[in-house]
UniProtKB/Swiss-Prot annotation:
It is an enzyme of class 3 (hydrolase). This is GTP cyclohydrolase FolE2. The record marks 218 as: May be catalytically important. The keyword Transmembrane does not apply. The lineage of its organism: Bacteria, Pseudomonadati, Pseudomonadota, Alphaproteobacteria, Rhodobacterales. NCBIfam families: PRK13674.1-1 (NF010200). Coiled coil: none annotated. Its EC number is 3.5.4.16. InterPro entries: GTP_cyclohydrolase_FolE2, GTP_cyclohydrolase_FolE2/MptA. Pathway: Cofactor biosynthesis; 7,8-dihydroneopterin triphosphate biosynthesis; 7,8-dihydroneopterin triphosphate from GTP: step 1/1. The gene is folE2. Belongs to the GTP cyclohydrolase IV family. GO terms for biological process: tetrahydrofolate biosynthetic process.
Length: 359
């Protein structure tokens, strides 16, 4: 006797399943996604087309294909997420490339540079194409850089992105060969420098930042040590510590301020710069130099201020000093500004911690 399996109980074959899936996919192609999802929770996954998993090395992009690519950042204002508010700075930070710089004493130097480029974004614009900032900058990257070249790069990406405000900042480590105090040796000192060009409301400002590392001997500790020696015959040594000042200056329009010029100014203000090459005679000289120039953090800020005020090429400026105490478990800090460029009601919470320079 033959037993027939009811059709309802028979499992569909693979061929039948493939045919059913093809029908489902054809239907889904012309059906709103919400209707597909309403059919069954697993339906969207079933009808998703099979995709190639091999990279198409031979594929080339023509103008028609390029025009078809979605561009969300240039979409309508309806795509804006959150408040329709002006963004003061939007762009890219820390893209690196080798850049040649003009110097006062050593011709042109090529240095690894970290670049930050930003523009303002109007309230009704969704976003920017950030790659344009890099492309605009790279168009000038083979030139020896000065503020004039930075200005041309800024003009390019400000125009490309149709923005009213823009900024470029370039950070690098600037090498200078410096002599020891007495032994006649020389060594390379490296200075963290940043160049910044700001265009805001049609007004442009050229700004230079420099981190200067020096030794600060506490005047109070020096006097107390001398008191112990004089009054009690007790040997005592004053405390001193590695200290850092971040000097930021606005270079007046049409003026040229070399990196080395700013270094000369800060060295004249505080002569106890940390040393590179040191023999015993240099170490003794450094002890004598520190004893001759004891300095509180307030003194340091005002000494730098006096030197900067003396140079007619410098407009507004800011001095941020940190004496990283060897006596205390805290640091002594000061901030001095002149002019509106660097004035601020609030300080970056990490401002002073960013002044630590690890050897």
């Amino acid at each position: 006797m033959n037993i027939l399996t009811p059709v309802a109980e028979r499992l569909p074959s693979r061929e039948e399943a493939e045919e059913a899936l093809a029908v489902l996919r054809r239907w889904a192609t012309h059906t709103p996604a919400s209707d597909v999802a309403a059919l069954a929770p697993e339906a969207p996954a079933l009808v998703y087309p099979e995709l190639s998993r091999s990279y198409p090395r031979a594929f080339t992009v023509d103008e028609a294909y390029k025009a078809s690519l979605p561009d969300l950042q240039n979409g309508p204002a309806s795509l804006i997420v959150g408040a329709k508010a002006v963004i003061q700075h939007v762009g890219i930070s820390n893209f690196r490339l080798p850049i040649r710089y003009h110097t006062r004493d050593n011709g042109d130097l090529q240095l690894e540079t970290s670049v930050t480029g930003t523009v303002s974004l109007e309230a009704e614009k969704k976003g920017i194409n950030m790659s344009r900032i890099m492309r605009s900058f790279y168009a000038h990257a083979e030139q020896a850089f000065s503020f004039e070249v930075i200005e041309r790069a800024l003009e390019d990406y400000k125009r490309d992105l149709e923005s009213f405000d823009a900024r470029i900042q370039m950070r690098f480590s600037f090498p200078v060969k410096v002599p020891s105090l007495r032994s006649g040796l020389t060594g390379w000192q490296y200075y963290d420098i940043a160049l910044e060009l700001v265009d805001r409301g049609g007004v442009r400002k050229e700004i230079m930042h420099l981190d200067f590392v020096y030794s600060s001997t506490c005047p109070c500790s020096l006097e107390l040590s001398e008191h112990a020696r004089r009054e009690r015959g007790q040997l005592a040594t004053p405390h001193s510590q590695r200290s850092v000042a971040r000097i930021s200056v606005e270079v007046r329009q049409g003026k040229c301020l070399w990196f080395e010029d700013l270094l000369d100014l800060v060295r004249s203000a505080v002569p106890t710069e940390t040393q590179v090459m040191v023999k015993r005679e240099d170490e003794q000289a450094f002890a004598e130099l520190n004893a001759a120039n004891p300095i509180f953090v307030e003194d340091a800020a005002r000494s730098f201020c006096q030197a900067l005020q003396s140079d007619p090429r410098i407009g507004d400026f800011r001095v941020v000093a940190s004496h990283q105490e060897s006596l205390h478990s805290h640091d002594a800090v000061s901030v001095l500004t002149e002019g509106p460029t660097f004035a601020a009601e609030s300080l970056d919470p990490r401002l002073f911690s960013s002044l630590y320079h690890v050897g």
